[in-house]
């Protein structure tokens, strides 16, 4: 986890103005700051140093590479001291290499004459951009950009189950850049990589073959993603976090309990060995505490709580001692985990999932085309674009960044995604949801597959402490939508 910033302006900007923006970005990279400055261009990186040496940052160069990422398979690509060295050479000499990298990445490369930048195709790390007649700003987060420009809100409709945003933000002139797209001197160029190219169904396989393939793949991916330093898991007692625990049994565990909301998280000790219980932080959250942390989240990130679950993510990152935090992000969308998938009336006209029902028609047609007209598979892919890329992934990244934590999401690893995207429908949804993951879970915990409510929050119950008013509808979700919008627009 690092923070990156690039500013290009026609009029000279004083260095203190740039450093003020870097101060906002500092939590993403608390170890040290590096930057290059001229009258017209400022480029910087705040560094969270996890493992390896810092030799790359100490070498003198005329160019500048600002990087936020982790290439888990970097050792496959040659004798590089760190993944940063590999990413730098790829950005400088051969950007096609990024399509072979497994892991999240966002980078900006400035050689003194030309600037190029890009983000990973799965939408895990990202860049925001503001541009007008005088200035262009590219940054890991919105908040530093707002130190340069007038803070003007724009309305972003809340139309899906969560407050999903693709390229738009609730700030005038600030956009999120397209995943996998290369930008050269701020002009969109070719796609470096994209998840559409990852969809290529293979030969028919049996359930046993699929389960064996996942077992081998999961072990390998988790081995490569495991850092040499201590790590933590955002631990709920559910299938996804327990699969991560099976590969990281010594990890620090952080469980957030929205009191009275999730019956599974209150039983997490049943899944754990005695030594693992000693690694567990169990944090019950009251209505007042929820409201307090909700306001802190909005104040730091300058973005809305797009989901009621964001406060739990915020508290997990805040209370984690380890610098690396593993999450189960994207497992439900990729492997068919939501209960609603068993009941949707699938149709080719549009997505009928509550997570993406108001999605862009052109994107829906592209999802349909990727699966040769199969509306079921297209719906899950549409949910990935809206619920993961448009909500959870950027939310998790900026939340982790606020507390100097690097978030690792193994279900968004390229190999795992390719496996999931090409699973036949019956191995995503049948008499149960996400059967592949549940079968894997049952190998370790044969008697503990509990019905899980999922992440929850106290947003509605915390309303008296959130300092906003709404017009009650009698529908908790409609009331939550008012809470999410009013807390952001009336306080920003």
Indicate where each model-derived feature is located.
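Adenosyl-5′-phosphate
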Residues: 1, 173-174, 309, 326, ...
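Cysteine-centered catalytic environments shared across enzyme families
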Residues: 1-296, 323, 439
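Alpha-helical packing segments of well-folded alpha/beta enzyme cores
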Residues: 214-222, 312, 316, 384, ...
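A glycine-rich phosphate-binding loop feature that marks nucleotide/adenosyl-phosphate handling sites
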Residues: 236-240, 330, 454-460
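ATP-dependent adenylate-handling ligase core
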Residues: 261-317, 335-350, 373-374, 422-429
